[in-house]
Amino acid sequence: MSQKVKAAIIGSGNIGTDLMIKMIKYPQNMELAAVVGIDPASEGLAMARERGIATTHEGIEGLKKLPDYAEIGVVFDATSAYAHKVHDEALRADGKLVVDLTPAAIGPFTIPPVNMDEHLDATNVNMVTCGGQATIPIVAAVSQVATVHYAEIVASVSSRSAGPGTRANIDEFTRTTASAIEKVGGAAQGKAIIILNPAEPPMIMRDTVFTLSEGADEEAIRASVAAMVAKVQAYVPGYRLKQEVQFERFGDNNKLKIPGRGEFTGIKTSVFLEVEGAGDYLPSYSGNLDIMTAAAKATGELLAQRIIERRAAA
C-alpha cells in the first residue's frame, strides 16, 4: 500500500490547474486522486482526465460520489469564499484536512516558512493572498530580530494575470493582507496596496515591503531577510531580492510620524522583491498566482507528512 496521502483539488480554473500540474510534476507526500469542477467543458478537467486523474463536474457532491473519496486525506479548495464555506463544512465533517486558497479565511492564516509549524494540527488552513505569501515572510523576518511598529506592502502584478475574481475582491485583498501582516508578520500595524500593472509585454510580480522597527541593527535585519528569502525559494525558485535591502534611520531630531500611531524613531527598512512563476501551467509572469499554488502545495505536503506520521504511530 502506498504511503502517500491521497489528495483532491476543488476548482478547475487557472489556480486549480496550476496546482494540479505542480502536484504531478513534483510529487512528495501526496498523490492527486481527484480534480473537481462545475463546468464539464473545463480545460482543467480535460487535462486531469488526460493524465488519468478522476474528475467530476458535479462539485463537492460529485467528489463525495467518487470511489476514492473515503481515502482522500487532504483537499485543496481553489473556488470562491462563498463556495468554500459550504465545502469546508462538508469536508471537515468527513475528516478531511482542508487547504483554503480562497479569501474565506475560516482557518488560520498560513505562510509556510513563518507559521506552518503552529498549524500542523489544524483541520483548515488559509493561504491568505498572493501578496501576503510574497511579502509577509519579509515582515516576519524583520519581526524576528526587531520590534516592528508598522509594515506596508505594495504588490504590483500583471493586469493580465488578474482574473475577474481578483478584480472583484481588491478591497478584500487589502483588508486580508493587512490583517495577516499583523497576525502572522508580527507588525503592530499593517497596510497593503495592490497595483494591477497594464504594461505589455506583461511584467512579473514585483513587491515592495517597508517596515518601521526598533531594537535591532541593520546587519541583523539584513541577515534575517536573506535567511527568509532562502526559505521561500525552497518552494518558489523564482522568488528573489530585486536589489540590496535599503535602510534609513530616524532619530530624535528627525522623527517620522506614523498615521494613527504617533512619532517613530528607529530604522525604516525597504525590501524590493520579484516573483517569477515556474511556468508549470500559468505563464512565468504570473508569479502572483504561482506563489499561491506553490505555497498551498508546500502546506499540503506538510499536512500529508503529519498524516503519514500518525499512520505509522497507530
Curated annotation (Swiss-Prot):
It catalyses: acetaldehyde + NAD(+) + CoA = acetyl-CoA + NADH + H(+). InterPro entries: Acetaldehyde_dehydrogenase, Acetylaldehyde_DH_C, NAD(P)-bd_dom_sf, Semialdehyde_DH_NAD-bd. GO terms for molecular function: acetaldehyde dehydrogenase (acetylating) activity; NAD binding. Its EC number is 1.2.1.10. Pfam families: AcetDehyd-dimer, Semialdhyde_dh. SUPFAM superfamilies: Glyceraldehyde-3-phosphate dehydrogenase-like, C-terminal domain, NAD(P)-binding Rossmann-fold domains. Gene3D superfamilies: Dihydrodipicolinate Reductase, domain 2, NAD(P)-binding Rossmann-like Domain. Belongs to the acetaldehyde dehydrogenase family. This is Acetaldehyde dehydrogenase 1/2.
